[in-house]
A protein has these predicted regions:
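Short inter-helical turns and helix N-cap capping residues of alpha-solenoid HEAT/ARM repeat scaffolds
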Residues: 4-5, 35-36, 66-67, 97-102, ...
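Hydrophobic beta-strand residues in large extracellular and virion-surface proteins
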Residues: 28, 43, 74, 126, ...
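Amphipathic alpha-helical scaffolding segments comprising HEAT/armadillo-like alpha-solenoid repeats
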Residues: 1-3, 10, 21-33, 40-41, ...
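Repeat-solenoid scaffold signature
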Residues: 67, 72-82, 169-185, 193, ...
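Alpha-helical, heptad-rich or low-complexity scaffold/stalk segments
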Residues: 3, 10, 76, 93, ...
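Carbohydrate-interacting regions of secretory-pathway proteins
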Residues: 298, 307-385
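Core register positions within helices of long alpha-helical scaffolds
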Residues: 11-18, 22, 46-49, 77-80, ...
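Residue-level detector of extended alpha-helical repeat arrays and alpha-solenoid scaffolds
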Residues: 9, 40, 56, 71, ...
Length: 385
């Protein structure tokens, strides 16, 4: 390897990676420490792809190499060779690592913790250790909690998201990159309260990713995505929330997307959502659906537009007559809405005159507490309506 050309070195590495000799990795482990720089770099690449439990010790040694190139390669290989028993050693390495090597050390810690039999106790111990400090270095451990993903880890990180905490930004970043969907509630709260544009962007992207991956039912997902759209601070975020509605397949998502079929910044995404939801739900029929599809058809452009137009024409031709869904709310005003008068038994005991009088009072109260706003029905009061 020391005298091999680049092409020859690649061939030799392939041989080491594919060798059926059970001793191959042991030989690599044995020689890597004393090899020249070129050989060490080649063998580090091999160990990052093929290793055994004894490989970690050699990598840890090379993390202290005076050769910066070898040291960097050793950090790159570290997550691929660590064992469960190495966790404490990795934490020690993480505490001393240069900024450019921190991510590799964090990933190695996550790997060593993932299937560790003592994982719960390790997390509690690590949580207790960092809880005593607000030093910037404590944030180095946040991605480990995010990667582990337990309730204990979530509790640890949410302790840092108060407005006056100096590690708040790092904690938010950890919540947004959580390895499962358990941080969704925390992200939902932050979505509705975070004002800083940079932090909001982190929260928003994490929220959308977590919500899409969650087991939240499609109707609730639709509501949350519509919320995300309203809180979005720029066009990219609005398109992201709008596009995610496609997977919910709900009529509410379809109707919401249809509102943006003529918006110059959003009509491309809205068109995609409308076409796909209607194509996947043949029961969505009626005048509104026809009009939305016709608008979507007019928005199409590009190499596939003719094919997609034909698909819409065919869909419209096959669509049964009639209405599948009639909204109680017209999206504009409170026409047809009435306040609730008592219960059915009491109403039945009232005279027509008494009922009419009480209905007038209930309607007035209803209009004080409810209003149509931006296509939504909004409750703004504290009554029983």
């Amino acid at each position: 390897l020391a005298t091999a050309s680049t092409k020859e070195a690649d061939v030799l590495k392939t041989l080491l990676l594919t060798s059926k000799n059970a001793q191959t990795v042991d030989v690599v482990n044995k020689v890597i420490g004393s090899a020249d720089e070129k050989t060490q770099l080649a063998l580090l690449d091999v160990l990052s792809k093929r290793s055994n439990p004894n490989s970690a010790a050699q990598i840890f040694n090379l993390l202290n190499s005076s050769n910066s190139t070898v040291k960097a390669a050793a950090y790159t290989a570290l997550p691929n060779v660590v064992n469960d028993k190495d966790f404490d050693k990795i934490i020690e390495v993480l505490g001393k690592a240069d900024a450019k090597d921190v991510n590799a050390a964090q990933q190695a810690a996550i790997v060593a913790l993932q299937n560790n039999a003592d994982k719960s106790n390790i997390v509690k111990r690590l949580s207790a250790n960092i809880s005593r400090s607000l030093a910037p270095s404590s944030a180095r451990y946040f991605p480990i909690f995010a990667g582990e993903g337990s309730d204990e880890s979530l509790k640890t990180i949410t302790n840092y998201i108060s407005q006056d905490n100096p590690l708040r930004a790092d904690a938010i970043k950890a919540l947004a990159s959580w390895s499962n969907t358990s941080s969704l509630d925390a992200l939902t709260t932050l979505l509705r309260t975070e004002k800083d544009a940079t932090l909001f962007s982190t929260v928003f992207d994490g929220f959308i990713r977590q919500l899409n991956a969650s087991k939240v039912n499609n109707d609730q997902k639709t509501i949350l995505l519509k919320d995300a759209f309203e809180y979005a601070q720029n066009t990219r975020q609005k398109n992201t929330a709008l596009g995610s509605l496609r997977a919910t397949g709900t009529y509410s998502a379809l109707a919401f997307a249809s509102r943006f079929l003529e918006d110059k910044d959003l009509k491309g995404t809205a068109t995609d959502v409308v076409m796909n939801i209607t194509a996947d739900n043949k029961s969505f029929i009626g005048t509104d659906v026809r009009q939305w599809l016709e608008k979507a058809q007019n928005n199409l452009s590009g190499s596939e537009s003719s094919y997609l137009r034909e698909a819409i024409v065919r869909h419209l031709a096959e669509m049964p007559k009639g209405e599948s869904y009639v909204s109680m709310f017209n999206g504009k005003d409170l026409t047809g809405w009435k306040g609730l008068v008592e219960n059915p038994i009491k109403r039945a005991q009232m005279s027509a005159k008494e009922l009419a009088a009480k209905q007038e009072i209930a309607d007035k109260k209803m209009r004080e507490n409810w209003k149509a706003e931006d296509g939504s029905l909004v409750f703004s009061g504290h009554g029983d309506n």
